[in-house]
Amino acid sequence: MKFGKEFSSQMVPEWQQAYMDYDFLKTLLKEIITFKRRTNNAPSHGGAKTGGGLNRKLTLYRAFSGLVSTPRHKRSNSSHDVEEGVQLTGSMRSGPILVNTTASHGYETTFLMAAEEGGEYELVFFRRLDDEFNKVDKFYRKKVEEVLKEAAMLNKQMDALIAFRVKVENPDGWRWEERTVEMTRLASDIATSAAALSASTPAGAKSMKVRSQEHMEAIQEGGSSRAGLMEDDEEDEDEQNETSVVSTGAIDNETTTSRMRGARPSPIDVLGRVKINNTKETPRSTIKGVLKVSKQTDLKFSRENLMKVEESLKRAFIEFYQKLRLLKSYSFLNVLAFSKILKKYDKITSRDATKPYMKVVDSSYLGSSDEVMRLMERVEATFIKHFANANRAKAMNILRPKAKRERHRITFSTGFSAGCVFSLIVALVAIIRTRNLLEMEGQKEYMNTMFPLYSLFGFIVLHIIVYAANIYYWRRYRVNYSFIFGFKQGTELGYRQVLLVGFSIGVLALLCVLANLDMEADPKTKAYQARTEILPLILLAAMFIVLVLPFNYFYRSSRFFFLTCLFHCLAAPLYKVTLPDFFLGDQLTSQVQAIRSIEFYICYYGWGDFRHRKSTCKESDVYNTFFFIVAVIPYVSRLLQCLRRLFEEKNPEQGYNGLKYFLTIVAVCLRTAYSIQKGQVAWRVLAAVFSFIAAIFCTYWDFVHDWGLLNRTSKNRWLRDKLLVPQKKVYFIAMVLNVLLRFAWIQTVLDFNFSFMHRQTMVAIVASLEIIRRGIWNFFRLENEHLNNVGKYRAFKSVPLPFNYDEDDDKDN
């Protein structure tokens, strides 16, 4: 794989704009190549023409630069002014560039051969190279500042956690003074990092105050109640051997350490300055918030609270470690990219610019700072002791989860199950045609009873396949869907796993259909009609059991994630609304017919109609009432979620979004009323009017708010500025399909009847079209969300911390 593709694949998706623009710099190099070719092919001043048989390298590069007779080894070595951060050259022969540092513009390169023919192209290249270098260095510096501040906060959290442990497990206390050597170690690292950051900042541009770092607290490295002190001696020995690299203006570590030792409070004093930050969202806490009941923030020293605090802080450390890993990767990739692009430049121009420029890169904050590495080491040590019971292997498996490998057996199983589905569909069609089942007596009863039962599995399988297609294209266009949904790293399913689940359900459902038809045709088993009717119920019960199975089989983390989001949707607005919750709520709005099929299951089997294959459900007022209710449950859930967000965020857009779902609820109720009472003109007119209004509103919201399109001032007219799919026509096709598929409801109002198609078949087709429309919506909705994250450089999740420090005490410290 070429470096450009490898570079793009290794980027943090949300930081794409902050990386070096490698592709654009390559285009500038191509312009230099084009100019050289054009120059070398032009006739010389003496009338002689360049011979076509000359060596390409000599003709294209060396003849142009005038370096053919100047061997590289004769060039004088360039000198460095380390103090000023300037790359100096003794003469033009000693190097083609001069790199210096300015307070206002950062790094600037002077191209010393701009007067040569074609030098303006190389001058443009170095100007853009400087812009990219300054951009990358500034971004990296900013992110390191952020993690240093977060590390200081985690220090305080660990102080409180250790004091909490002492209070819970050893109320009499312990000898705090004996542990001060270990407690100051991380604080020393952070103070050194802050000093190095400050010293490496150009004059007048320092954004970090050294004094603010002097009071950073240290993570106490003492053994927890669960972990022994087996590593204490080793760490003390490492501490003596550890050296700190501090630039000019750095804080003296010993002074800082002694200052912190003197200022460090005892464990009891620490607990007196903190309160529990109860971030767990429950219906009870929501109701208390509405009633303005004060939250319980006093510390209760119980093992249950200790476990909650440890789990919360454990998640915070895991997320913090992931930030450090991404920053480390960011620094390494960009330094490597600068090296690669400069080597390409040297190869094209036969100059020697890589060495002097890379010396500047290596000596810059981007290439020389080791704050991230030191923080990673300290986080690892802390996590091993306090959250992994001194088990390094266990801790590293948590901090560095292994990437999921694509297994051949999954691919084989997916392909095999897909082939089985195709074969069973062919067999089903053949049986229906050969036995002429559509013309047999009882065909209408079968379509009114068994077809709705089995169509439920069809809706589920279709939605799963559509979701698998979404995952495939999200990965193809580098939409970070696992981060957006909040999947635990290493547990997200790929499209092959999702397809395997869908095709497996499809195989079982089709086998049940064929078994049912076969038993219907066999005179020996036809008498056991009640038993044959129960096959779909058995399959549905088996699916439910697998879904709620607590054992670690069949993708347990994904199943529990789905059940959690589903419960949050049903319990709206008692839970804080997150993107996975309202995303699943939108999926449910496209599965209204499937939800009605579940209602039919309850009626058909609960009231005993399956014994006679005769449905009396529609004759029941209770069934008809719930026929209304179940259809609007997903929309009511989304409406309540919008109201919850409107109440919390005070964002009027959520009110308009809620109005959209309210109009949809009215339209669905009117269409349902008309489907029950055919021939009522009033119901028909009202259903058509409200359905049209709701469809227009929903379509506009899809395009403008959910997809971010229809922007007239965009550089991509009527779309948006940033597009992940390079073919613009895809967006216009998607908008047209969205409109056509959304208006599929029109058949319920205009009573389209086809002699060759049963009404239940028409209902199933319309429901399937809505599922397909939802799949199209899914891709562009997450694309827009991903681009919003990219615009805000949002690559991390915010993890709430378990303790809140008093503000007054923080200011004093």
From Swiss-Prot:
Tissue-wise expression: Expressed in vascular cylinder of roots, leaves and filaments. Expressed in receptacle and stigma apex.
Locations listed in the record: Cell membrane
Induction summary: Not induced by Pi deficiency.
UniProt superkingdom: Eukaryota
Pfam families (alphabetical): EXS, SPX
InterPro entries tied to this protein: EXS_C, PHO1_SPX, SPX_dom
Biased composition (Acidic residues): 230-241
Occurrences of domain EXS (ranges): 618-813
TM spans (from-to): 412-432, 451-471, 497-517, 534-554, 685-705, 730-750
Lipid bilayer topology: Multi-pass membrane protein
Side Extracellular, residues: 433-450, 518-533, 706-729
Spans annotated as Disordered: 214-266
Cellular component, GO annotation: Golgi apparatus; plasma membrane; trans-Golgi network
UniProt topological domain (Cytoplasmic) ranges: 1-411, 472-496, 555-684, 751-813
Keyword Nucleus: no
Keyword Thylakoid found: no
GO BP annotations listed: phosphate ion homeostasis; phosphate ion transport
Domain SPX, residue spans: 1-359
Keywords: Cell membrane, Membrane, Phosphate transport, Transmembrane, Transmembrane helix, Transport
Protein purpose: May transport inorganic phosphate (Pi).
Family: Belongs to the SYG1 (TC 2.A.94) family.
Name the record gives this protein: Phosphate transporter PHO1 homolog 3
Source species: Arabidopsis thaliana
Chain's gene name: PHO1;H3
